[in-house]
Amino acid sequence: MTNTALIAGAGGAASKRLIETLLADPGWSVLALARTPRQSAGRLTWIAADLFDGPACARALGEHRGVTHLFYTARAKHGETGVESVEDNVAMLRNVLDAVEPVAARLEHVHLVQGTKYYGMHLGPFRTPAREDDPRPDVPNFYYDQQDLLARRARGWAWSASRPTFIYDFAPERARNAVTVVGAYAAICRELGRPFDYPAPAASFDALRDMTDASLLARAMRHIATTPACRNEAFNVVNGDVFRWRDLWPRIAAHVGIAPGDVRPFKMSEWVRDKQPVWDGIVRRHGLAESRLDDIADWAFADFHWAHGYDVVSSTAKLRESGFTETLDSTKMLVDHLTRYREAKVLP
């Protein structure tokens, strides 16, 4: 029997590759729920609804009775302070559950995408490599409330959660993406004849980090949601290697064709304010698609992304033991994504 996945928050970082992954298997059809839907085709059906609006969710989902798997990838709008609304995020998830549960008699599994903020990575140094059973920091965190909500409501269906770190992808439609930040920043430095300085403290340059590729995350989500041993469990999902920006920065510079610079901490969100004319010149000279720098990259996100002067590393032992053994070279992944942006005429 065909599985039917409902992806709530289908415009987010984790959802695009999940849609591709599921549709590559003829045993799946996909319902993509988003505030702004796209064109439905084949086994993909787009549904419009505001997840903050419970009655609207119920109306939009009431006729879709065949859902077997719910993948919840949505997040409430938030800034880059690291703190996100517990109330808003729990309300959105509850609205989707309230709409799906009464009509989806075949519902088997609800999967929740979380992240390393579960371990308090946004608050300061934390125990690494982070393990799924590490104690929760005693602070408000919507991940805790969402997971507890699923655990309470799971009757006749199971829940699970994935915990990626920063997600990297080729996603021209999404500015909150470290790949385009790096690419645009390097291009501007090269245009101005300036060195490719690292824009964060030395502690960040030397700390151990890991990454999560969006496609690898999608495949892991499918595995977790369909593997009996993963029922009612959470799993870290990262590429499986670790790196230091000190080692990766020269590789990026070589790929872009610029000399690596020094560690020079500054706010990228402030640095970029007068760079649009420079970017316009780059666009004209390289025949790129016309764009605004703020549409290419989220510079406030960049400040948050590189700010952590401590290790951000997660253990994948539990995921591997469950049978998902894929790994990915993070350096190669980043270079490959930059190459795809160049080929798409988004970056030079």
Give the positions of each predicted feature.
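Conserved Rossmann-fold NAD(P)-dependent oxidoreductase catalytic core, especially the SDR/UDP-sugar
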Residues: 68-72, 84-87, 91-142, 160
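Conserved glycine-rich Rossmann-like NAD(P)H-binding loop of the short-chain dehydrogenase/reductase
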Residues: 26-37
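NAD(P)H-binding glycine-rich loop region in Rossmannoid oxidoreductase-like domains
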Residues: 38-95
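Conserved beta-loop-beta element that borders a ligand/cofactor-binding pocket
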Residues: 149-177
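Glycine-rich Rossmann NAD(P)(H)-binding loop
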Residues: 169, 200-208, 235-242, 253
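Substrate-positioning beta->alpha
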Residues: 145, 177-183, 200-225, 232-233
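Mid/C-terminal beta-alpha module of Rossmann-like enzyme folds, strongest
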Residues: 217-303, 315-317, 321, 338-345
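N-terminal Rossmann NAD(P)H-binding glycine-rich loop of SDR-like oxidoreductase domains
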Residues: 3-25
